[in-house]
Structure formats: structure tokens, C-alpha cells
A protein has these predicted regions:
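A conserved acidic beta->alpha catalytic loop
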Residues: 27, 40-50, 94
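Glycine-rich, basic loop-to-helix element that forms the pyrophosphate-binding segment
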Residues: 64-81
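Short aromatic/hydrophobic "clamp" motif used to bind/position activated sugar donors
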Residues: 86
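Conserved donor NDP-sugar-binding/catalytic core segment of glycosyltransferases
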Residues: 94-129
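A short, conserved alpha-helix in the catalytic core of glycosyltransferases
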Residues: 146, 151-154, 158-163, 168-196
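Non-catalytic, C-terminal membrane-associated alpha-helical segments of glycosyltransferases
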Residues: 231-302
Length: 302
């Protein structure tokens, strides 16, 4: 008997966070009735996660061999997924209920102009994070510029057509780049502010120094990939100046950080320039409007 194609694939990337991963996988009980395919990308954890996770139907672990980063892992998960809709989760995320996920699935099934669903960040007790730390403002369903990568629902065919996440980013910033390219294709991101997903940030593997370096580096790469040259010439210095602003605001000791960023950008600039496809002025204008939070998503007609 041939198994039916699942309606949903859940993809989780993890590295050396066994407790967080177990909590994340256990939280999928909320959507068990959807019978999702569950894929876990183990990014070369010191102890393979396959030995920690309980055996369950439709769960498969994909073991990476070299610690290539979660962006590469997400691309692998998307390539392996069987479903048309894929819920990507960080290992320190956890579901609180099923309604938000089902609502997102319904939007993707009904509206071919929507390619991604953004969810709201919440504490473990279900309290939402401050509005400034969410994909958008307000409590109504709306289009937004980008989702937050900790939990997002993607239309797989759009992801494949766009070439997925840029693996050169390694860590951080892939959401903005991907959503900007989606917008340039005429596709949207819808934010469900009442669809809360836990983001219990696990400190393992996180450092302020790494975050600062990669955010600055990837903002520069984003400009090289997506901006017209007239904007690149001032955006690159502006992005580099922002490194110092963030460093002092967050009190991060990183005396060699800017040198590292400059070396990385110089190394990757040639490939980025060869692959660049600047987005249109119309896309930039739409992006600014969406960041302003003034684009409500229309309720479906019965």
C-alpha cells in the first residue's frame, strides 16, 4: 500500500541542544492529528540525536557530518520534505496549540499569492514577547516584510523556485534576504499575531560576538546580492558603521570583529556579485510599506 502524501512536513534543525530538541519534538503532539512528516537535521551534534529521540511514526533524523550551520540544514530539510507546506522550527521553539498552524495551512492552500506564514514569539507560559520583537505590529492578520526564522511555515514549491536560502549566510539574516526575493516575485508573507509559538532561547551555541559578526557580514552580502549599485556604494559603509553602534549598545567585546567582517565580505564579494539579481524599485517601495505595518490581509470570503 502506498502511503498518502502528508499535508505537512515539520523540519527541525539542531546542534548540541538535546533538552530543547526533546521539548520541541514533544510539543508536536499538538498537531498529531495532522499526521505530519517530521524531519530533524542534526548538524553534527557531539552525541547523535537519533539515540536521544523516542521512536515514532513518520520521524526521520538526517545527520550532517561537518557542522555546516542551520541555514544549510534548512535547505536540506526543504529538499527532503514530502509535503507541499513545511513548518520549519528552531530546536528551542515549541508549539502551544494547533489552531495557528492549521490556519496557516489553510491560507497557503487557499491563496497562491502567499508563500510564507509568520508566527508570534512567546514565552514558555504562553505570554507573547513585546511587539517590537515580533514580525509585525498590531493584533490583526496582516502582510509583513519578513517572518522570524524560529518558526515559519513555507510553501515548498515557491522555496524551490527561488533557490532556497543563501547558504553563504551560514547564520542569521537569511529570512530578510529570502522574503525580499519573494516580494520581488510578487509573493507575500502573512503574519498571524495570535498564533503563538514558544521561543525559549537556548544559550548553547549562541554568543553575542558571533551574532554581531554574522549580522553585519550578512547585511553587507544582502546588499551585494539584492541592491542596485547606486545603493550598494552607500549601504556597505552604513552596514559597517552599524557594527560599532550595535557593539557598543550591546557591550560586546570584539576588537577583531570588524577585521573579520571585512575579510569575509571581501572573500565572498565576487561570488555574490556574480549571483546578484537586484530587486526592483517597486519591491523596495513595497518592502518599506510592509515594514510600516499598514497592509491588512483580507479575511476569506465564505
Amino acid at each position: 500500500m502506498v502511503n498518502a502524501k502528508p499535508r505537512l512536513t515539520v523540519g527541525i534543525t539542531t546542534r548540541n541542544r538535546p533538552a530543547s530538541l526533546q521539548r520541541c519534538v514533544e510539543s508536536l503532539r499538538h498537531i498529531a492529528h495532522l499526521q505530519p512528516e517530521i524531519l530533524v537535521f542534526d548538524d553534527a551534534s557531539d552525541e547523535p540525536v537519533s539515540s536521544m529521540l523516542p521512536s515514532r511514526p513518520h520521524l526521520r533524523v538526517i545527520r550532517g557530518g561537518r557542522g555546516s550551520g542551520y541555514i544549510v540544514g534548512r535547505n536540506i530539510l526543504m529538499s527532503e520534505a514530502l509535503a507541499d507546506s513545511v513548518l520549519l522550527l528552531d530546536d528551542d521553539a515549541a508549539l502551544l496549540e494547533s489552531a495557528g498552524i492549521e490556519r496557516g495551512l489553510d491560507i497557503l492552500a487557499r491563496d497562491s499569492g502567499v508563500a510564507a506564514i509568520a508566527f508570534a514569539q512567546a514565552n514558555e507560559d504562553g505570554r507573547p514577547w513585546p511587539e517590537s520583537m515580533q514580525p509585525g505590529s498590531g493584533q490583526s492578520v496582516r502582510y509583513v516584510a519578513a517572518f522570524i526564522g524560529f518558526a515559519h511555515l513555507l510553501r515548498r514549491d515557491a522555496f524551490v523556485a527561488l533557490g532556497g536560502y543563501r547558504e553563504s549566510f551560514v547564520f542569521y539574516g537569511e529570512e530578510k534576504d529570502y522574503c525580499l526575493r519573494l516580494l520581488d516575485r510578487g509573493l507575500g508573507v502573512v503574519y498571524l499575531p495570535d498564533a503563538l509559538v514558544v521561543h525559549a532561547q537556548d544559550a548553547s551555541g549562541r554568543t553575542g560576538q558571533r551574532y554581531l559578526r554574522y549580522v553585519t557580514r550578512n547585511d553587507c552580502l544582502n546588499a551585494l546580492y539584492n541592491e542596485p549599485i547606486r545603493r550598494v556604494v552607500w549601504l556597505l559603509p552604513a552596514r559597517l558603521a552599524l557594527y560599532y553602534k550595535m557593539r557598543f549598545r550591546w557591550r560586546i567585546q570584539d576588537p577583531a570583529g570588524l577585521r573579520w567582517v571585512l575579510k569575509e565580505v571581501a572573500t565572498l564579494a565576487g561570488a555574490a556579485l556574480r549571483a546578484r539579481k537586484p530587486v526592483s524599485r517597486r519591491t523596495h517601495a513595497a518592502w518599506r510599506r510592509l515594514r510600516g505595518g499598514t497592509a491588512p490581509y483580507p479575511a476569506p470570503r465564505n
